[in-house]
Amino acid sequence: MAEPTPAGWPSAPELTPAPGTPSEAAPPQDNWVYWAMLPPPPPPLSSPVAGTEPCQKEQPHVEPQPTSGAFPPFDAQILPAAQPPFDAQAPPDGQSQFNDQQAWNFQASTPWYWGLSPNGFPTYNTSFHSPATHSYFPQSYANYNDFNLPQNRKQKKKKRKEPVFHFFCDTCDRGFKNQEKYDIHMSEHKKCPEVDCSFSAHEKIVQFHWRNMHAPGMKKIKLDTPEDIARWREERRKNYPTLANIERKKLLQLEKEKRGEVLTTTQYGKMKGMSRHSQMAKIRSPGKHYKWKSGGARQRAVLGLGNRARDLKPEIPTKVNVDPLGVLIHSDSESDKDEKSQRAIVPKEVTPALCSLMSSYGNVSGSESEPEEAPIKTEAEVLAENRVLPSSPPKSPRHNVRTTARTVLRAKWKAQRSGLRKITLKQKKSPCHPLFEPRTRHPHLLEMLLAPDIRHERNVILQCVRYIIKKDFFGLTAGSVKTEDV
């Protein structure tokens, strides 16, 4: 009895075995799994009589498969269709497979079959699962594909053997393997063109030697003879800071101060303010370079009073007995060059074009420390007053001078008050001002070259001043005593 088929599936057709040999019997009809697995039956024979010799010759001879109980021979070829499916059950011992009938022996059109893998799961073997014989990588990557990997990927590079030299030229720092090459190199040596120099080497090395030793501006140190070496060592011993040398330098310094030679040559080469380390130190420790003040109102008042006093009155020393030598020593060496010229006020008769030109020149020549808004506002106010006043009749020159002075003072006072009111956000956030302002002017080349001569001239002037004070050449001491008594 046939097994029931699922709904929608066609029923298995009844297979009628063709007349022939017993080995060509069809499988039983009661198992539809075998019907699904087996290919269609072969076409019917053309000859009327089955089993004749011509018909048997046309069919290829296929060896019958052994029964289920016996093992196939060692050299027998097992066809894929002859293997049982993975869900087939072995027949009982007493009953032969397929009711004592063997299955069809055929060669499948496609080389697929169901087989059992070692782990128990079915594998579907097809022709494209054949072992790879060709690499899909280009030929340039042949050493890096999966089929041609080197045994040791990290192949160490072979160390090059260092050449062995038997002849050396110490001056040129070169080595040679044989005597011939060494002789050729020594024949190329040339002597230094200087008269007192005995240096000899290759032409290029001689050029470097001349640039480093004999070029103009280079210090000439001759250490060729033992006498020169001994003299050089003696000079170095004199300058070495031993205790005796330190005491000797102190005595020389005291003698110079007594004579009046106080000034020393400025070391222009150090440039302490421009170095990177000093700038970084200022950034890291701002407290050392800034002077803090408490109270913004007090600071405004102090600044306002100071500016007003500076504008109204020139600085006059309060002390009567002032040492001129001390004033010269503590004064800046460049004070005569850096004196700031006072701002000229535009007269009333000047045309507007000339006024703008002079105001622009005044802005350029003005000091950098003062705010830029104050002088501009002052000049604008003065010009406005000068434009209004020409309609009035001219007065005496003294009266004009007084009026201009008053207007200038009023304008400056107003500008200072307005400038103090306008405080920037930076000044509000940081109530500090730099204690040491950076130097805006750098020394010129001529000044640096003439530094020793300038020092000598100023020391001579200081010596003259010291002599005048000690000898009371002008009678200043007697006059000062009389004024004190009065």
Swiss-Prot record:
What molecular function does GO assign, one term? Answer: protein-macromolecule adaptor activity
Q: Does the entry feature the keyword Phosphoprotein, yes or no?
A: yes
Superkingdom is Eukaryota
Q: Which residues carry this modification: Phosphoserine?
A: 331, 333, 335, 396
GO BP: any one term: box C/D snoRNP assembly
InterPro entries in the record: NUFIP1-like, NUFIP1_cons_dom, Znf_C2H2_type
- Gene Ontology CC terms: fibrillar center; nuclear matrix; nucleus; perichromatin fibrils; pre-snoRNP complex; presynaptic active zone; protein-containing complex; synapse
Q: Where is this region: Disordered?
A: 1-71
- Function as written in the Swiss-Prot or TrEMBL entry: Binds RNA.
Q: What is this protein called?
A: FMR1-interacting protein NUFIP1
Q: Which organism is it from?
A: Rattus norvegicus
